[in-house]
Amino acid sequence: MKKIRLGVIGTGLAWERLHYPALKELADRYEVAALVNRTRSDAEAFADKIGLDRKNVYDNYEEMLKRNDIDAVDVLVPIDQNYKVSEDVAKSGKSFICEKPMAPDIGQAREFLELSRKHIVKIMIAENYRYNEENNKIKQLISEGRIGSVVYFIKNNITCFPCEMAEDTYAGTEWRQHPDFPGGAFLDAALHDLAAVRHIFGAVECVQAFGKPQKEDFNPYLSVSANMLFKNGVIGQYTYFPSGKEQQKPPVGFRIFGTKGEIYLEEKSSGVINVAYNDGAPEKIGYTPERGYYNELLNFYNALNGSEDISVTPEMEFGDVKTVFDILDSVKSRKIVYVDDPQPVEYQPHAGATENSRPYIQ
């Protein structure tokens, strides 16, 4: 089995705590061949930790991209740099993984779609929620009709970003506290949840959202609440509250109501999916939490070796990112915003505004 020699751009928290632990499990498939970080000493410290010679450490990723012995690249940089770094990697002819979101705004996200069309490279967007076991099992339960036809869902995400700002956490990073991109934490974190519901229910027809504004830099709204209509007729309500604490137990979590029963996921790390059927019978379905990183890196390896396709392509991720920005647009305009469908003709400002090609429809 040929190992993929991986070059890493960005050796911060996402690399150290998410990608590298998964790569250790895949040591028979991957070899870390080079590390790049703008603070070179941080990359050198990590190289020492894993026994990588410091000659393979860089503070300039362009130098690393010149190497012919690098098979693929893992891009883990701040959100505002994702597109620029990815473009340079694509131009080098190397296949790569890019952490989500693919870009800091919808314009750069559209440009990202062109990278795999212009360059003969394979690109994965590392949206781990699409690879997490709980979301795939829930999707399977629904496709099997275990709770009948889905009528609606409720999904709550309540966290305390301010509580973690002074700690050694993602919230403690300067660029997340004072983001140089629209949406702040909503783009960074709520994107995961929206990717999950799109993975489970499919393409979104339209959204209508409201937000409670705040002055703090990390997120433009104290909370955001969005009503969602999916193309298959499912309706649902998603709320993101990054400055709160959910004191009552069990939490609202993720609840899906069908004609024959209900699915309840307390939180992604709970390890169990609760199913309650209308005849009174309960069922508990176990899963291993946080397997998305392992699964996505395994998928990337298999794709590079030609045994399977990449599951989360830029086209797939574009729909997730567009949903985020469409929700934010709806909050600002207080209007319904169409996501994966063009706006109905009767509401078009002019006939030429309709888009016929929607590559991100799932």
What is each PLM-predicted segment?
Residues M1-I50, Y360-I361:
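N-terminal Rossmann-like dinucleotide-binding module
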Residues E31-V32, P282-Y287, A303-D320:
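Glycine- and charged-residue-rich phosphate/anionic-cofactor binding loop of Rossmann-like
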Residues E111-Y129, S149-V151:
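Rossmann-fold dehydrogenase core element
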Residues D188, L194-S270, Y294-I310, D340-Q362:
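Contiguous beta-strand/loop segments that form the cofactor/metal-binding neighborhood of enzyme cores
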